[in-house]
Amino acid sequence: MAISDMRRQYSKGSLSESDITSSPFSLFDQWLKDAIDAGIPDPTAMTVATVDSTGQPSQRIVLLKDVSDKGFVFFTNLGSRKAQELSVNPKVSCHFPWFFMERQVRVCGSVEKLSVSENAAYFFSRPKDSQLAAYASKQSKPIGSRALLLTQFKQLKDKFANKALPVPDFWGGFRIVPHQIEFWQGGEDRLHDRLEYNKAEDGRWSTQRLMP
């Protein structure tokens, strides 16, 4: 299959210095709203990249569950590969691919764990079957078959049919605290727009345009 000639022209918008806000989170909020309003499937999906102790990177897609001036929040099993790697090396990068809008956002930073109360607030907001799934799956561990997983899920569902589940101690959230955020808008003839925010030690953000 020949793929070297697969390409398309980008023409849906531009990104100029007049679009810059003092905080990158204001621009991110607007872009996220645009993605949601456009009906893009899974607009909160982001790829999170981590690195293990040997320097080997790995990536996976998770869902953004909160964003504020503090950073970007996601939740996971604390025994998962990503959580284990973040416990050794908290440096992380995430990426939002809004292809329909011809936009991307790239974030670099470090993670911090959420508090017990923050974890509980989100856990209890989830549908009960999602809560059960957190218990049924020992994320990233081998399992003999899908049937075994479904059996474990059903056993838990029967056990907790009439009672609430406690917040699992092996599950929780991370906040990506960024020091760099890049906004990318596809442009005609591959002359894309790239605006990068960088955070100084005093907490203020500066911006610069990058060549495509």
From Swiss-Prot:
User: What HAMAP family would the database entry show?
Assistant: PdxH
Q: What class of enzyme is it?
A: oxidoreductase
Needed cofactors, names only, are:
FMN
Q: Name one Pfam family in it.
A: PNP_phzG_C
Alphabetic keyword roster? Flavoprotein, FMN, Oxidoreductase, Pyridoxine biosynthesis
Cofactor descriptive note: Binds 1 FMN per subunit.
Q: What does the record give as the organism's lineage?
A: Bacteria, Pseudomonadati, Pseudomonadota, Gammaproteobacteria, Alteromonadales
NCBIfam families named among the record's database cross-references: pdxH (TIGR00558), PRK05679.1 (NF004231)
GO MF annotation: an example: FMN binding
Q: Which protein is depicted? A: Pyridoxine/pyridoxamine 5'-phosphate oxidase
Q: What is the stated purpose of this protein?
A: Catalyzes the oxidation of either pyridoxine 5'-phosphate (PNP) or pyridoxamine 5'-phosphate (PMP) into pyridoxal 5'-phosphate (PLP).
Q: In which pathway does it act?
A: Cofactor metabolism; pyridoxal 5'-phosphate salvage; pyridoxal 5'-phosphate from pyridoxamine 5'-phosphate: step 1/1; Cofactor metabolism; pyridoxal 5'-phosphate salvage; pyridoxal 5'-phosphate from pyridoxine 5'-phosphate: step 1/1
Residues bound to substrate: 7-10, 65, 122, 126, 130, 190-192
Listed InterPro entries: Pyridox_Oxase, Pyridox_Oxase_CS, Pyridox_Oxase_N, Pyridoxamine_oxidase_dimer_C, Split_barrel_FMN-bd
Q: Which family does it belong to?
A: Belongs to the pyridoxamine 5'-phosphate oxidase family.
GO biological process per UniProt: pyridoxine biosynthetic process
Catalytic activity, per the record? Answer: pyridoxamine 5'-phosphate + O2 + H2O = pyridoxal 5'-phosphate + H2O2 + NH4(+); pyridoxine 5'-phosphate + O2 = pyridoxal 5'-phosphate + H2O2
